């Protein structure tokens, strides 16, 4: 044990953690592009139909939709948006100019080399881990506990996604600038480094301009003032004024620009949808605690939300018993716990995923290390046998989860996008390509997911010079009955469900108010809703302006893991399609 402690307090440990983190995420260099990367490439390179029809610019890369209702209806009419979004208020506008700048550099210097783009992301991740290691030592001293926290943070498998996905680089930048802010604040308050009064708020601004996740560092600043400062209450609260000013002006600019989220199943805007956000915060708080401190990962919420919620609540109760003794005695532990808890507030606005845990993990690993330090310092021979067995079991579990399983899993999570890309590419290759299909409308009866298997495929093909008109009439895993009513019309009926399955987080496009008899008009089709179940259409008729077998149309359906050609039955006949399922 003494040897292990000496290693954790080694002067070169911060460098070791950086090398370890980079080494474990090195496979991500070959991830290539995936998901939003396709769209960002089209925007940054410009001179293509996709970028010309979007409000985003190279300097404002995350502006997808400014909330203009007429623009939304235009996109629905032109079938760029799915028909079930009719009547919805939609907005998707993130203000992240610093992150946009980092991507602009990629496409300015090495536009055809994704490997170098990923190398830039890994450099940011290396800087993040190094700063975290330095922060632990500044707060906890050059101790084995600080080293343990740094080690656990460096190999946290939750970091694989932001380290390996180019479009998620904004989280790395936000956390890097957030940590510099906290380090500068610490030096200002502890060493009377007055320059820190300028550097720290400036870094907070850079963190916020990198990504909304930067809000989380304000929780650590507040916790610092409450638990770590030893000045008067007035002096501690006064030290926070520069950050309040930065937050105020950032929020003002955010509001004036019209940034925010509306009408997206994946996000909940805390300002525009306050009550739904608070309900989701209550649901997701225990999920984040469970996924960050223990097991399974947060992403399992997508598969088993109820199980994760109830297990998370039970685990939160267990955490009170585990950490209460150290929280009572150690103000540093209280600092980490409070910062961790407050950092959950911004990420609860997003569908739970491990890629959002960079800030939360900072406090979580610090708290675990404080618990180890506190527990190791107790006179064990004076405790009961049950207590000793319980503590040993907990120590072993924490070491297995964060010291063994996490580093073993991190390489896989950092390059998991290659698996996603392969599945999207397989589906994309099932669609014919070539100049003869330039004006062809590719329509699929069903798709497992509209974002991944419609929009992302269209964007992928666009990056390859194939500007594909692709849409799906339904989305989800419900089996369908397809009835041909006439040479121009079909009726789709869901078997025991609805035509759109958007309850899961990966279905990002929310539905508007849908009712029986509703008519939605698109450029070449009129959709008439016949039946509704739970507010979503379960049966609808699609009246196309041209015959279904017109040469302008190519029809497909989802068959196992890819698209397959679809042939309509005779007029008056019905065929059955299995649900469009997909397995990541």
What do the PLM-derived regions correspond to, one by one?
Residues 1-451, 456-460, 525:
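Polytopic membrane enzymes that build or remodel cell-surface glycoconjugates and lipids
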